[in-house]
Amino acid sequence: MEETGDSKLVPRDEEEIVNDNDETKAPSEEEEGEDVFDSSEEDEDIDEDEDEARKVQEGFIVNDDDENEDPGTSISKKRRKHKRREREEDDRLSEDDLDLLMENAGVERTKASSSSGKFKRLKRVGDEGNAAESESDNVAASRQDSTSKLEDFFSEDEEEEESGLRNGRNNEYGRDEEDHENRNRTADKGGILDELDDFIEDDEFSDEDDETRQRRIQEKKLLREQSIKQPTQITGLSSDKIDEMYDIFGDGHDYDWALEIENEELENGNDNNEAEEEEIDEETGAIKSTKKKISLQDIYDLEDLKKNLMTEGDMKIRKTDIPERYQELRAGITDYGNMSSEDQELERNWIAEKISVDKNFDANYDLTEFKEAIGNAIKFITKENLEVPFIYAYRRNYISSREKDGFLLTEDDLWDIVSLDIEFHSLVNKKDYVQRFYAELHIDDPIVTEYFKNQNTASIAELNSLQDIYDYLEFKYANEINEMFINHTGKTGKKHLKNSSYEKFKASPLYQAVSDIGISAEDVGENISSQHQIHPPVDHPSSKPVEVIESILNANSGDLQVFTSNTKLAIDTVQKYYSLELSKNTKIREKVRSDFSKYYLADVVLTAKGKKEIQKGSLYEDIKYAINRTPMHFRRDPDVFLKMVEAESLNLLSVKLHMSSQAQYIEHLFQIALETTNTSDIAIEWNNFRKLAFNQAMDKIFQDISQEVKDNLTKNCQKLVAKTVRHKFMTKLDQAPFIPNVRDPKIPKILSLTCGQGRFGADAIIAVYVNRKGDFIRDYKIVDNPFDKTNPEKFEDTLDNIIQSCQPNAIGINGPNPKTQKFYKRLQEVLHKKQIVDSRGHTIPIIYVEDEVAIRYQNSERAAQEFPNKPPLVKYCIALARYMHSPLLEYANLTSEEVRSLSIHPHQNLLSSEQLSWALETAFVDIVNLVSVEVNKATDNNYYASALKYISGFGKRKAIDFLQSLQRLNEPLLARQQLITHNILHKTIFMNSAGFLYISWNEKRQKYEDLEHDQLDSTRIHPEDYHLATKVAADALEYDPDTIAEKEEQGTMSEFIELLREDPDRRAKLESLNLESYAEELEKNTGLRKLNNLNTIVLELLDGFEELRNDFHPLQGDEIFQSLTGESEKTFFKGSIIPVRVERFWHNDIICTTNSEVECVVNAQRHAGAQLRRPANEIYEIGKTYPAKVIYIDYANITAEVSLLDHDVKQQYVPISYSKDPSIWDLKQELEDAEEERKLMMAEARAKRTHRVINHPYYFPFNGRQAEDYLRSKERGEFVIRQSSRGDDHLVITWKLDKDLFQHIDIQELEKENPLALGKVLIVDNQKYNDLDQIIVEYLQNKVRLLNEMTSSEKFKSGTKKDVVKFIEDYSRVNPNKSVYYFSLNHDNPGWFYLMFKINANSKLYTWNVKLTNTGYFLVNYNYPSVIQLCNGFKTLLKSNSSKNRMNNYR
């Protein structure tokens, strides 16, 4: 709808949705939900002040340099450009490629078109004479690019919104697509747009007569001329202001001349860009002039060029027709892609073997088809340079099984193949080096020759095997290597000294002993490799090893003087070098490596530092006593091994890799390789000799291979963790814009709020309004206190006014602390109370928005540039609102450092910066290409254009180059094919990116635009499939083959697309097509597998660019808790001990807060006041911090219930999230270390304790032993008070019960003023006392009295238990019919008595225990105050037990 001169703006609440059910439209801003009219701004008349606009435009166009330019220079420039065009032909599409592309796109090319270097359309017959004029006009048009760019820079949309359904697509927000209609266009006579009018093909508008056609063309020209007269209206500035801006900022093209030089030098190697330098010949004194090429590095600082990606390397990446990410990965690979057919086959098998691990195929699964898919993927990546998103979207049938339920190579698999391809090329380079090295030695070694013959197996293609070969050559052929070095360099003297000692040994007579061992290292390798004794060892017929070596020493005493007096040294030397030969044998190493990799186990061995530092709650707690961890463990939990490696680097532990039965394994290898079956003494001696050497060799091999496996395991675990990080990040990116009402799916207008630190009434509440396009409209500062009870309506009215003014469809909120939750509930209350709804009567949802991007944005350089005068909280709210519109674009606009700083995964710190960056970038690439980018919107919207670098084939440099190329066009793109015809993209990058760069189809604009625009350009259908899409449309419409053939011949197949989109029954017609049969027929005729492409075509014809992302995810429950508090399930959980600060008292409850500002409640039963029967405010102080135990967490209200009781605080519950299964956890070692640590802590505590001084006559600075020594000479009942080993809140009374018998009584102190002061409350045996004297009088003296009463009783016997037992037995024999009982002291448990008795001489002797208390004698659950009562009670108990026994016997 367009506004006429006397029309009025429609109020926002009266606006109507136009064409709600128009499903035929392709992606446009309307579908993003933008309103047609903007009530916050007024449209300006496009014809206003034309004279002023003309002045401004003239100011843009006039260029003094152009006016003063010499005509010859202009001709020279044309020639250079012509040369450049010729040199670019190699990078561009060939004529056949272009013909095919144009045919698929539905455009005919004639021979004249094919021969045109600029790929223009054919001219009409009467217009050939204007060709030269048009060509020259292009130069003038290109000079006006800078003018149009400045006009684009200052242009802004006058309308805020358009009506229309959002249609759930990716067109997140940015600028209205109508901006592109209003973009300023160059209108010089003979300009590029005038040319396009003359290049309409004959079959277009064939029914028009010449007069009608000319009138139509003139109308178009008139419209364009009018659009030029708008610069002041577009910018909203006067010409004086615009001139002033030019004076200050320039036009942004001051250095185009330098870039032009650089581009020419890169593209066509023009030698004109050279500067002469003069040099003086030192010998002759003559002056010589030399030429030096001028580059950007001669003009700018290298660091600035690197920062702006403009070094020579960057410019080369820009211009090379290979995806940028591939160029970066392949930078270190020489001669990439030139592999032999054998290496290509090996790569396919090698990569298939690695990828198949994740596919969990059955053991008998036929991998032929899978390897074919892997081979296809490798070909697409290495030969065709197609990036992962393109392969997954448009070549999926080539990377999947033909069976419906078969395998599919996922995007993860394809990215793995990309990395593995680089790894394999590096391996091939190393292999080629070793081969050249081997060839130059001019030797024939069977081991090396066999290795290179068998290199077509995947297991051979490992770097470790190749390293074995190289080490073997260095070890065995050191002399030959030295000779080769001398021959190559002409220098004498040995350079290769690595194995010089072995060479000396091999040249000595002692080496003869190695031959007498009876089997060479090569034969041992053959035996072990075949697991059979192919070459049995031969024992010396007559001599033992010692005798053989002694005979050699005697025969060569002159040459072996060092060994003559030391036979043992000679034996050790022979064993050493024989074991060295064994350890270097490649077949032995390969067999051991293969077995070790399958069956290794990993153990953790703690260092002293690790035992001390790895405690509960430590990052490495779960690996402290890890043992017997298998490869499967680490595949399931890769972070576990990475933590082991990290802890090892910190010297906390060492990771030991070993085989489960390593000793038995070594014995087995020895038996099949070196052991003879002879039983003679000589044979036994030689077996022992060989075994010692073999064990030495195996120790060395296991040491090397263990390190290799550890390195490989580290790399594989890093890949697995990186993949997990990538998936977690993809869930963040894979969110569609927030849609408040699914029945009205439009991008919402957003009001975002934050209460900052939550100091209500003191700090302002900030609100920000952002419209549907993501434009910041205004911010609000609310100074009213939302919790002011005296005038609550004031805040409510303010909020209501803001909402009525903005008419938002959704409200987003977040903040730095839990007070935001209180504010959130208040907002809900206000909206409900005042029944606030949006302009369409819908409820306005309030959601918590993820603020990790907003936190980084508010203080970023980007925010300072966008909103220099706004405070951080306003910028924070802007980012919240933008996040609701597009999480993807918010993340895409972060810098690489900011992205890496995101907390994505708990183990991302285990990855290197490069690994983390690659994982995050591939996630970006997958999601951005799922969504795609609208080309014309990206041209003048930097925020939206940030996603371009992740488009398939692009990167940071190519995205910059792409945008610059688009801006130089100075007009919107009308068709994808223009990316090729306008030389914006070359063949490979176009193929990669075209399907993910779309051009919005807008019906309103069609009558003004060139007919080159194709409706399929606004779909996910790739241009290579346009012709296929038109055939699908024709078949769906059920046209007969003759009509289809006629349209195909005329090049008007695209009409079927338009007809289908207008057909109301198109869904039923498309869904009725048998795509499987069609795909089979297509493959049979063309060899192309297109079933997935056909499915994509049908979906896109039904609903172009349907939203494929997941719904927006507002924060919920524990996510809100974590966002507002910063606490996680590992730092704040039920049972955790946390510090809390007392804020206030409520009745007898205590209100506290944690460091993260979580409000905690201590009810009256969970603090010491309940036990002491005192109010809480007498025991606890406001502002003071106390340890507390979390009892319950209320995530919804962000509160918790905690306990301050001592017994709760001392019993912290720490959940164990790892297994302590004895098979994988060293429980025995854990217990031993715990006991050792306890003893050590006790010893350290005793050594470091400060001696307390208690002002009491019985207090002595003794320990337990010293107290006993002091009392040993004292009387019974004497005592001392001393320190306790339990800590400064305990004391001990040590008192003497009898000779060498002492009791230590614990006194617990409460309510201490300081650690060394005496507590105000003292507890002994659960009884409370006020001071030490009270304990002495009421407790200790009573026990002494009762002890004396017992020892004075006739029923007490002194002496040991053995003595008393003997006395009772003797008494019972003398008096067989009498019962007997006596008490005695329990020397094992001071403070207890034995009660021993016999019923008669024939009964057994019974022993009961009696406890001495301060109130009596405790026997069988009863306390007796005197000895007499104790004896009577004992007799009563005895009679009762006897009666029960008789009753039981009777029954």
Curated annotation (Swiss-Prot):
A motif (Nuclear localization signal) lies at residues 8-12, 77-85, 120-125. The keyword Zinc-finger does not apply. Signal peptide: none annotated. Residues 1-12, 180-192 have a biased composition (Basic and acidic residues). Its main location: nucleus. SUPFAM superfamilies: Ribonuclease H-like, RuvA domain 2-like, SH2 domain, Tex N-terminal region-like. The keyword Transcription applies. Keywords: Chromosome, Nucleus, Phosphoprotein, SH2 domain, Transcription. Residues 1257-1354 form the SH2 domain. Residues 1-217 are annotated as: Disordered. PROSITE patterns: SH2 (PS50001). Transmembrane segments: none annotated. It is found in: Nucleus; Chromosome. Interacts with CTR9. PANTHER family: TRANSCRIPTION ELONGATION FACTOR SPT6. Histone H3-H4 chaperone that plays a role in maintenance of chromatin structure during RNA polymerase II transcription elongation thereby repressing transcription initiation from cryptic promoters. Mediates the reassembly of nucleosomes onto the promoters of at least a selected set of genes during repression; the nucleosome reassembly is essential for transcriptional repression. Essential for viability. This is Transcription elongation factor SPT6. It comes from Saccharomyces cerevisiae (strain ATCC 204508 / S288c) (Baker's yeast). The gene is SPT6.
